[in-house]
């Protein structure tokens, strides 16, 4: 179940504790005989939607860190050439790009499933939550390494992304999401693999079908 509380009501105390992520508000709520509205059976839907929203936040961090790391690697020179030419830096940039793309695909699918609800949403949201926060954390950390010393200054934004990704790791709990996904699979739940495309895409589909027939 889900309990909805009016934070301005009697018996409700709201405190703002310090947070690792200063860019996002946090609160500690204390209830003392406060009135609540209970949404029976709403916990699963709330959990799933929370996973979709926070996973989208996480892939946004991953994408920004990936883009900024690649851009910096191409402009920063060391030993007379851009650091993007060094194998170790290339590997970092490739790893963050791969993690970002994989998590982004999962989050897009979870967002599509939000209108469906039920087990389809639970499945897609669990996949997104399993991938997104770890991807954000990886990208924030490797982006910091690519940027080098400038990234550990207060003036640079890298520490903000590291803070947000660290907090999201706790909020999303990828391990719990993976366990929920395993339970769904054991129950026989699978994700529908159809993708809705606009009408103008049908002509392209015909071309693809014809090409597939030719190369069989």
Report each predicted region and the residues it spans.
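C-terminal helix-coil-helix/basic helical segment that borders enzyme active sites and/or dimer interfaces
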Residues: 70, 78-81, 97-131, 145-147, ...
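FAD-binding core of flavoproteins
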Residues: 1-67, 71, 191-203
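Conserved catalytic-core motifs characterized by acidic clusters
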Residues: 37-47, 73-87, 145, 149, ...
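Oxyanion-binding "anion nests"
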Residues: 55-84, 91-92, 96-100, 104
